[in-house]
């Protein structure tokens, strides 16, 4: 299905330095009626003035935010998914393939994702490709669980401590609803 795009420049979109359009990033929500998935689209407009016409580049990316399951993320998909989760609580399991305790808690973590249908559960493999994100989030040991609300870490559990993880999720859910 072709995409038709009509742009009319607003006075605020004009760049005073170039007399044309400056690069801008627009975010738009794309409604999706599927349950239990929410989709959000990001449209980036980068326009430049060329003579009497403007060149516009637009890209659209869809991010799925699922509840009732564990979603694998990486350094490129983590923040868009957290932002798309909106007001939902997000729990991130940071693990490695070789970690014994990570393997032990993985099925319990999956069961938690099925129990809490109002929480988004994510997994991040702390491999060399994802090291920048792991460093940004301050990981020191695996597994580490980070609980986020409104794009901010509100709780952390280090180690495969199932009871501590459940207590942290319950505390964060209570704080979010109260």
From Swiss-Prot:
GO terms for molecular function: enzyme activator activity; enzyme inhibitor activity; protein domain specific binding. Signal peptide: none annotated. Residues 1-22 are annotated as: Disordered. It is found in: Plastid, Chloroplast stroma. InterPro entries: Thioredoxin-like_sf (IPR036249), Thioredoxin_CS (IPR017937), Thioredoxin_domain (IPR013766). Residues 58-174 form the Thioredoxin domain. GO terms for cellular component: chloroplast; chloroplast stroma; chloroplast thylakoid; cytosol. The active site is at 99 (nucleophile), 102 (nucleophile). It comes from the Eukaryota. The record marks 93 as: Deprotonates C-terminal active site Cys. It holds the Pfam family Thioredoxin. It comes from Arabidopsis thaliana (Mouse-ear cress). Residues 1-57 form a transit peptide. Residues 7-18 have a biased composition (Polar residues). Glutathionylation at Cys-126 decreases its ability to be reduced by ferredoxin-thioredoxin reductase and reduces its efficiency in activating target chloroplastic enzymes. Disulfide bonds join 99-102. This is Thioredoxin F1, chloroplastic. Belongs to the thioredoxin family. Plant F-type subfamily. The record marks 100-101 as: Contributes to redox potential value. Keywords: Chloroplast, Disulfide bond, Electron transport, Glutathionylation, Plastid, Redox-active center, Transit peptide, Transport. The modification S-glutathionyl cysteine is found at residue 126. Thiol-disulfide oxidoreductase involved in the redox regulation of enzymes of both reductive pentose phosphate pathway (Calvin-Benson cycle) and oxidative pentose phosphate pathway. Under light or reducing conditions, activates in chloroplast the glyceraldehyde-3-phosphate dehydrogenase, the phosphoribulokinase and the fructose-1,6-bisphosphate phosphatase, and inhibits the glucose-6-phosphate dehydrogenase. GO terms for biological process: cell redox homeostasis; negative regulation of catalytic activity; positive regulation of catalytic activity; regulation of carbohydrate metabolic process; response to light intensity.
């Amino acid at each position: 299905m072709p995409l038709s795009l009509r742009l009319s420049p607003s006075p605020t979109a004009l760049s005073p330095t170039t007399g044309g359009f400056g690069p801008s990033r627009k975010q738009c929500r794309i409604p999706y009626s599927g349950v239990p998935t929410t989709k959000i689209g990001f449209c980036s407009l980068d326009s430049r003035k060329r003579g009497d016409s403007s060149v516009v580049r637009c890209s659209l990316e869809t991010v799925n935010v699922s509840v009732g399951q564990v979603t694998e993320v990486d350094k490129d998909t983590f923040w868009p998914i957290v932002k798309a989760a909106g007001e939902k609580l997000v729990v991130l399991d940071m693990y490695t393939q070789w970690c014994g305790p990570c393997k032990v808690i993985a099925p319990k973590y999956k069961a938690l994702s099925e129990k809490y249908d109002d929480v988004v559960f994510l997994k991040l493999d702390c491999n060399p490709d994802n090291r920048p994100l792991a460093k940004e989030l301050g990981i020191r040991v695996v597994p580490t669980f980070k609980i986020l609300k409104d794009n901010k870490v509100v709780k952390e559990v280090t180690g495969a401590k199932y009871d501590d993880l459940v207590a942290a999720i319950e505390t964060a859910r209570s704080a979010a609803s109260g």
